[in-house]
Amino acid sequence: MDVDIDPEQLFTEKMPKNYAQPDVLNHTFDLLSNLHKLLPNHLVEVLHSYRSEEDKNKCEKPEFSGLEKILARHQLPKEISLSPKPSLMPSWRRRIINNISGNWKKCHLWQKSTYEPPMGTIVARWTKKNLQPTEDLKSVIQRLSALGPIISVTPSGRQSAVVVFRDITSACKAVSAFQSMSGGSMFQCSWQHRFMAKNKTWSRKCTSKVHLEKRESTVGEPQELHN
């Protein structure tokens, strides 16, 4: 349905409209969707100015563009180039459809990723401050390699990296030693694996086991030297 636009009537109309009525709202939407017909298309005028007389004679309708000539040749309806009409669907039905289409978000299977990182994977983060010693990727790798063998290091941004240890004990040492950036430390390690990040009990047990082994090794060394 084409809407005839009268510019004088458009700008001189003073009667208030009741947009609660569907007919008034639809007419206003159709009027706004056809306002582009009042705007001059300077690019098309410039394009037509470069046409030769021979090209104009070849075209049945020289004022049409290439797409418009295709539409005219196939005799497609005029509504194909217009803006879509407003939907007359009731709000309660649209709400039901939106709820049905959004139910897939509640499925927990979609939230699980197919890739699970190794258990000994941690995320190392560091910050740079003027009054503190600067940290970079090289110094972070040196500090973490002292805790155990590292399989891979993947930079993730300018001040973070994903580090994979060969064994989970070394990862526990790193997370236990660098839990937060407090106390003047500009370096922090956290778990990347969801199981290790959620299960704090396992992380504490592994960390306490590491401290116990370290304490036993330090206690046993003087005895071996004494013997």
Curated annotation (Swiss-Prot):
Q: Which domain of life is it from?
A: Eukaryota
Reported tissue expression = Expressed predominantly in the testis.
Q: According to the record, what happens upon gene knockout? A: Deficient mice are viable and have normal fertility.
Q: Which Pfam families match?
A: DUF4523
What name appears for this protein in its UniProt entry? Testis expressed protein 56
Organism lineage reads as: Eukaryota, Metazoa, Chordata, Craniata, Vertebrata
**What gene, per UniProt, encodes this protein?**
Tex56
